[in-house]
C-alpha cells in the first residue's frame, strides 16, 4: 500500500497512487558455523534467488528539471535477482577479533507494461544491475576499527535506457574508530568517522552531488 507521504507529501505525493500487487518466487540457501575456539571462530554463507512480478509498482520519479520528484505507478515490472552474503570472524590473538563481510546483489528490474513503449523491457530508473559492499571490522577489548566499501553499478535516470540517460557507477569508502568506556553501571562510547575517505565525486541521484570527504565525531552515553 502507498504510504501517507507517497500520497500527500508536498510537491512529491500523488493522491492517485494505486497499491502494488506482487507475485513472488524465491529459493534460498543458508549455512552458519560457529566454534568456541580456534583461529576461525565463525563463518556463514547465504544465497537467495528470486523472480517477482509486480503490478502498479510504486516508484519515485523525477519531473521537470529533476529538482522535484513525484511518486507514480509503473504498470508491470518483472524483477529477477540474486543476493549473496558471506562473512567470517578470525581470532588471531587473544581478545582480537577480525570480521569480514561481503554482500553482492544482481537485480534486473524491467518494465514489461506495453510492447509498444520505447522503454519496453528496459531497466527501470535508478535500479542498478550490480551492487555490493565489503566491511572489515577489528575489535580489541574496548576498541574497534571499521572499514566499509560500497559499490553501486551503472543505472539509468529515465525510463529509456539510452546513452543520454546513463548514470555512471559510484563507490565510496568509509572508516571509523571507536572506544567504549564503563563506569560502574554506566557506559559511554566515543566514535570518529571519516566518510568518503578518498573524496570521490559521485551522484546517487542525477544533479544531486554527494559530499566529499567529511568527518563526524559522536559521543554517546547509556544510563
Give names to the regions the model predicted:
Residues 42-53, 72-156, 187, 198:
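Gram-negative outer-membrane beta-barrel transporters
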Residues 1-23, 32, 36-38, 52-57, ...:
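Outer-membrane beta-barrel translocator/channel fold
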Residues 98, 151-158, 166-168, 177-223:
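C-terminal beta-signal and adjacent terminal beta-strands/loops
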Residues 9-17, 67-74, 116-122, 159-165, ...:
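Extracellular loop and loop/strand-boundary signature of outer-membrane beta-barrel proteins
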Residues 29-37, 45, 86-92, 140-142, ...:
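Outer-membrane beta-barrel proteins
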Residues 13-15, 23-27, 45, 70, ...:
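Hydrophobic, lipid-facing positions within transmembrane beta-strands of outer-membrane proteins
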Residues 20-80, 87:
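Membrane-embedded beta-barrel scaffold of Gram-negative outer-membrane proteins
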Residues 17-23, 39, 74-80, 124-129, ...:
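Short sequence motifs at beta-strands and strand-loop junctions characteristic
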Amino acid at each position: 500500500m502507498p504510504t501517507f507521504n507517497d500520497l500527500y507529501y508536498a510537491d512529491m505525493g500523488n493522491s492517485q497512487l494505486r497499491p502494488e500487487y506482487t507475485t513472488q518466487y524465491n529459493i534460498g540457501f543458508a549455512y552458519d558455523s560457529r566454534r568456541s575456539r580456534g583461529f576461525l571462530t565463525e563463518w556463514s554463507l547465504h544465497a537467495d534467488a528470486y523472480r517477482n512480478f509486480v503490478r502498479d509498482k510504486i516508484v519515485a520519479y523525477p519531473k521537470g528539471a529533476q529538482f522535484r520528484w513525484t511518486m507514480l505507478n509503473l504498470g508491470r515490472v518483472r524483477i529477477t535477482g540474486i543476493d549473496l552474503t558471506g562473512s567470517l570472524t578470525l581470532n588471531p590473538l587473544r581478545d582480537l577479533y577480525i570480521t569480514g563481510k561481503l554482500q553482492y546483489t544482481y537485480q534486473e528490474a524491467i518494465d514489461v507494461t506495453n510492447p509498444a513503449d520505447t522503454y519496453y523491457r528496459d531497466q527501470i530508473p535508478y535500479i542498478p544491475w550490480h551492487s555490493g559492499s565489503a566491511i572489515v571490522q577489528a575489535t580489541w577489548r574496548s576498541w574497534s576499527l571499521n572499514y566499509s566499501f560500497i559499490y553501486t553499478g551503472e543505472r539509468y535516470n529515465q525510463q529509456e535506457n539510452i546513452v543520454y540517460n546513463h548514470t555512471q557507477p559510484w563507490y565510496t569508502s568509509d572508516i571509523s574508530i571507536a572506544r567504549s568506556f564503563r563506569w560502574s553501571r554506566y557506559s559511554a562510547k566515543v566514535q570518529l568517522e571519516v566518510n568518503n575517505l578518498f573524496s570521490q565525486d559521485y551522484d546517487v541521484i542525477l544533479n544531486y552531488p554527494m559530499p566529499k570527504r567529511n568527518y563526524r565525531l559522536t559521543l554517546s552515553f547509556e544510563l
